[in-house]
Amino acid sequence: MMKKMLLAALLICAAGAGLADPVEGVWKTKPDDNGNFGHVQIKPCGAAFCGTLIRAFDGSGKEIASDNIGKNIIWDMVAYPDGFYDDGKVWSPDRDKTYNSDMTLAGNKLAVRGCMLGICRDGGTWSRVK
């Protein structure tokens, strides 16, 4: 009986492990102070989520080369109920600043916010690319 219960518990955990979190995917950022924006791929990293810049664009939407491609924009973001992610960091390339961050997911929109010393900066609403 105990073996059957243990096997059932393991199967439930294995089935749940295959489900992707809704925040996973590629997101288009809000334009920065220079009008540039990027595509950030969010995926699990340990027990949290990280986002890496995978493409960069100028204000007209033309893809541009950037030294920031491949750099983490988001890290240590922990999932909480109801589409809320917190306890992470976000790096703003245009200001070269790292902020304590939280995110709120609603469908294909991701509201990103960063705070430093009690002052918060709205990172804007990102749109799902895929």
Model-derived features: where do they sit?
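Short, solvent-exposed mixed-charge patches
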Residues: 129-130
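Sec-dependent N-terminal signal peptides
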Residues: 6-10
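Short, exposed beta-strand-loop hairpins at the edges of beta-sheets
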Residues: 94-95, 100-103, 109-123
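Central antiparallel beta-sheet cores of small beta-barrel/beta-sandwich binding domains
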Residues: 23-24, 28-100
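Positively charged n-region of N-terminal signal peptides that target proteins for export
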Residues: 1-5
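N-terminal signal peptide c-region/cleavage motif recognized by signal peptidases
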Residues: 14-15
